[in-house]
Amino acid sequence: MLFAWITDPNAWLALGTLTLLEIVLGIDNIIFLSLVVAKLPTAQRAHARRLGLAGAMVMRLALLASIAWVTRLTNPLFTIFSQEISARDLILLLGGLFLIWKASKEIHESIEGEEEGLKTRVSSFLGAIVQIMLLDIIFSLDSVITAVGLSDHLFIMMAAVVIAVGVMMFAARSIGDFVERHPSVKMLALSFLILVGFTLILESFDIHVPKGYIYFAMFFSIAVESLNLIRNKKNPL
């Protein structure tokens, strides 16, 4: 039955684990979303966040509903130099290259200064939504495949996605506003996206990089930058 899992403690444990997994793996997605939305006119940003995340949620639910197709993404399509390449590998490779290009472009605009950046400041609303949704698929691909392995209940997996996206919607604006107010934090976020891009490329060649190392590096960098912000606030130049 659809709701038979409600009385199963293991099902609740799976729901909590999957929700936490989706939220943690959604951190890089929130950072990317914040940077994309920042290029839109102020009046469109909140709408873009909601639409982008809602569309991303629908895409994730569609992936979960197509479990058989998702699990086949890991089947080899062809071999290059004894390296088996699957559809998942190609998606991660293209996603990693796009992230590196996007973040590098943003860093270049920031270094060139405000006048150069203003030429490309205003982005297309539809283009921003599409970017958010496509990158969310790439970010969530591994978590969806992992979810399939952690739970047999489709409803639990979908509930975890809905809860996680709800948390992301709640946090996205605060994170985005904070990044926009502090250029040094924005540069740190862009550097993190480049790191994530390289990680996706390595993953596409079956070189596994433990996510814990990446998130530790990110949180440590944020902690150091937070101390700098506090110091500068107390002792302005």
Swiss-Prot record:
The keyword DNA damage does not apply. It is a multi-pass membrane protein. It is found in: Cell inner membrane. The chain crosses the membrane at residues 18-38, 51-71, 80-100, 125-145, 152-172, 187-207, 210-230. InterPro entries: Integral_membrane_TerC (IPR005496). Residues 1-17, 72-79, 146-151, 208-209 are periplasmic. Keywords: Cell inner membrane, Cell membrane, Membrane, Transmembrane, Transmembrane helix. Residues 39-50, 101-124, 173-186, 231-237 are cytoplasmic. GO terms for cellular component: plasma membrane. Belongs to the UPF0053 family. This is UPF0053 inner membrane protein YgdQ. It comes from Escherichia coli (strain K12). The lineage of its organism: Bacteria, Pseudomonadati, Pseudomonadota, Gammaproteobacteria, Enterobacterales.
